[in-house]
C-alpha cells in the first residue's frame, strides 16, 4: 500500500517525480519492523522519541505520555532533512476516528507542516547551517472510502477534498500494475 500511494501520487497528481514523506505510527503494529516499508518502495524509515506505551483512546491521553514539543521537533527535523514536497499522513487528525497514537501522529504532522519552514521554530536545528527551513507544498491524508461512512460522522459533515486514483492501472515505467506491485 505504501508503494502504491507513493507511485500513484507521483504519476497522477503531480505529473513529475516528487519526494513524499509518509507519517504514521508503528505503535502496536509489530509487523512494522519485520517487513520494513523500504523493501516495497525504497523509502527511508525514521523514528521519533515517542514511547510505544500501549493502546490509547484519545490524542490527549497520548500527549500526557509523549513530550509533544520533543516529538514535534523530531518530525520537523525529518522534514528539514528529507525535504519532501508532500506530506502524507496515514490517519485523520480528528479525535475519535482512530487510536490516540494515530491521531496524535496526524496532529503532529500538521503542526510540523506549519513549523518546518519557519526559521524561528526549533532554531537549534539550523544553528550549524546543515539544515535549512523547508516548507512542503501540501499535506495529504492516505485514507480509504470507509473512513467517510457512518461511525464518527455528524449530520451535515462532508468528506474533505479528495484525490482518488485507480490503483489497478498499469505503470509502463515499472512494468507492472500497482496491484501487482502491492501483492
Predicted segments with their positions:
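The feature marks non-catalytic terminal segments
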Residues: 115-183
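Active-site beta-strand->loop->alpha-helix modules in alpha/beta enzyme cores, enriched
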Residues: 1-123
Amino acid at each position: 500500500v505504501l508503494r502504491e500511494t507513493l507511485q500513484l501520487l507521483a504519476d497522477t497528481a503531480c505529473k513529475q517525480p516528487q519526494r513524499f514523506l509518509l507519517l504514521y505510527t508503528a505503535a502496536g503494529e509489530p509487523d512494522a519492523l519485520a517487513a520494513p516499508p523500504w523493501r516495497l518502495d525504497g523509502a527511508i524509515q525514521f523514528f521519533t522519541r515517542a514511547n510505544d506505551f500501549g493502546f490509547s483512546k484519545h490524542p490527549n491521553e497520548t500527549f500526557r505520555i509523549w513530550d509533544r514539543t520533543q516529538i514535534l521537533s523530531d518530525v520537523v527535523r525529518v522534514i528539514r532533512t528529507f525535504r519532501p514536497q508532500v506530506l502524507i499522513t496515514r490517519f485523520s487528525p480528528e479525535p475519535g476516528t482512530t487510536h490516540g497514537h494515530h491521531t496524535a501522529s496526524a496532529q503532529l504532522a500538521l503542526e510540523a507542516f506549519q513549523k518546518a519552514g519557519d526559521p524561528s521554530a526549533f532554531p537549534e536545528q539550523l544553528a550549524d547551517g546543515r539544515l535549512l527551513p523547508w516548507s512542503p507544498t501540501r499535506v495529504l491524508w492516505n485514507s480509504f472510502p470507509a473512513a467517510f461512512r457512518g461511525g464518527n460522522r455528524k449530520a451535515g459533515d462532508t468528506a474533505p477534498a479528495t484525490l482518488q486514483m485507480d490503483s489497478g492501472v498499469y505503470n509502463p515505467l515499472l512494468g507492472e500494475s500497482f496491484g501487482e506491485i502491492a501483492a
